[in-house]
Amino acid sequence: MRFPLRFTLTQARHRARMKRLGRKRYPTVLMLEPLYTCNLACLGCSTERYSGKLSDRLPPEKCFAAVDACGAPIVNICGGEPCLYPELKELLEGLFARNKHVILCTNALKLEEKLFGVVPPTHRLLLMIHLDGMRETHDYVTNRAGVFDKALDAAKKAKQLGYNVYLNTTVFRETKVEE
């Protein structure tokens, strides 16, 4: 998968800086999981990925502390479902203010409500939408009918609005080769 050129250039600058500093090991991407709450119960996720309580989420200041301590130029927000994080707008704005590139891993069911019209498209944000196969397979894997169509509609709308959109697929035993 090819990432946007700006993401790639940022990574290259980070690696060059680390080399100049003589560091052999350093983080390049921070996987930030601010919550373990999800609106789906997919086959590929362990129970703690979708059964967490919203009240157990990390507050934005702890997220920012982790980001600042890590120093990676890219932050991948995943967990449960990031669009359920009540402080998502604050978190994204804080990451952009720190000049971070952000990958938001989402099932796309709440993009309309939580992102579109709330956080404008920017070259610093990449929406990574999970589509685990075509309609029948994806709906089976997510344990809910209609999720494929909702996710695909959200991906199309995000593109129309100017967001960077990538699709991510997990291949399961149930995935058909043709997909």
Residue ranges: model-predicted function:
Residues 2-123:
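Conserved alpha-helical substructure of the radical SAM core
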Residues 58-62, 146-150, 175-179:
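Soluble or luminal CAZymes and related metallo-dependent hydrolases
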Residues 82, 108-113, 127-144, 173-174:
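Conserved radical SAM core fold
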Residues 122-124, 162-163:
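A short helix-to-beta-strand connector/capping loop
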Residues 142-160:
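Glycine-rich S-adenosyl-L-methionine
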Residues 154-178:
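Conserved strand-turn element in the central/C-terminal portion of the radical SAM core barrel
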